[in-house]
Amino acid sequence: MNRRLTFFHGRHKGVERNVIISGAQQIFTPEDETETELIEDDRPYAGWLFLGLGYQTRFENQLDTLELRLGVIGPAALGKEAQDFIHDLRGFAKFQGWDNQLRNEPGVIAVWEHKRKKGYMNTNSRFGVDVIGHAGFALGNVGTYANAGAEFRMGWAIPDDFGTSAIRPGGENSTPNSVWNPSIAVDRNWGLHAFVSFDVRLVAQDIFLDGNTFKTSHSVDKEHVVADAAVGLSFLYRGVKLSYAHIFRSKQFELQDHSHSYGSLAISYTF
C-alpha cells in the first residue's frame, strides 16, 4: 500500500517509504500535588490518550514525515488512573487535584516535518560527524504550531537514520532503510556517538494550556515561543540503539515559575 503513496517525492527512483503505527498516553499536572482545589496560576490537569498513523518517505539525505494522531483528552484518557498506578507501584504521593482536569474532548493533530542531513565519515576510523536540520508544522485542536531546529552528531559508526527520536509529533526517525550497517562498525558490532539538538516552536494553540475547545475549563496564558535543547549519548550494538538525553525546555506559560528539564532514556531495535 505505501508504495502507492507518492505525494512527497513522486516516483523518483530510489525513494523509500515507511508506514508507522504508534500509540501513547501523556499526562500533565501542576507542580503542587497536595492541593485539591483549582490552582489558577498553574497549568491544568490533563490526560491525552491517542493512536497515531504516520507515513515517511526518504530520498537520499532527505526525510519527510506526515503523521495523524487521533484520541481523547479528559477523564476518558485515564490519566489519573495511570498516574495513580505508577505512584502506588513506586510508593510516591498521589496528585490530589484530578477533579479539576480538562473535560472529555476528541483530540486530533496532523503533523508534517521535513529533515535534511549532511555529514562526513572517515572510512578508516569510522569516526564521523553530521548535521540534521528539520522544519515543520502541526494543525489540530490538540496543538497548532510551526517548528524548526537541528541536531549535531559526532562519534563512531553513526547510524544511517535522522537523529535521536524526539518526544514530539513527527519526531520519529527510524527511517526506511535505516537498518544497522555492518560496513561501518568495528567487528560489525558497535557504535557510539554524542549529540546536541534544539527545536523552536511558534505556538498558536496548545489545548493543555489553552483548555478545552468547546467547553469552559481551566486555562493559563501560554508563551507563543517555546524552545527545547538536548544533549545526550547513543550506544549501538548491532540493531539495538540505547540513548540517553537531558532535555531543557523554556517556559510554556506566562506564570510558570521556572523552565523545565528532564531526562529521557530510550531503547529501540531496527531490523
What residues fall within each predicted segment?
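Residues that define the transmembrane beta-barrel architecture of outer-membrane proteins
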Residues: 1, 17, 45-49, 64, ...
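Long, hydrophobic/aromatic-enriched structural stretches that serve as scaffold segments
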Residues: 12-82
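Sequence/structural signature of outer-membrane beta-barrel proteins
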Residues: 28-32, 73-77, 117-121, 138-142, ...
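Outer membrane beta-barrel transmembrane domains
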Residues: 31-35, 151, 157-271
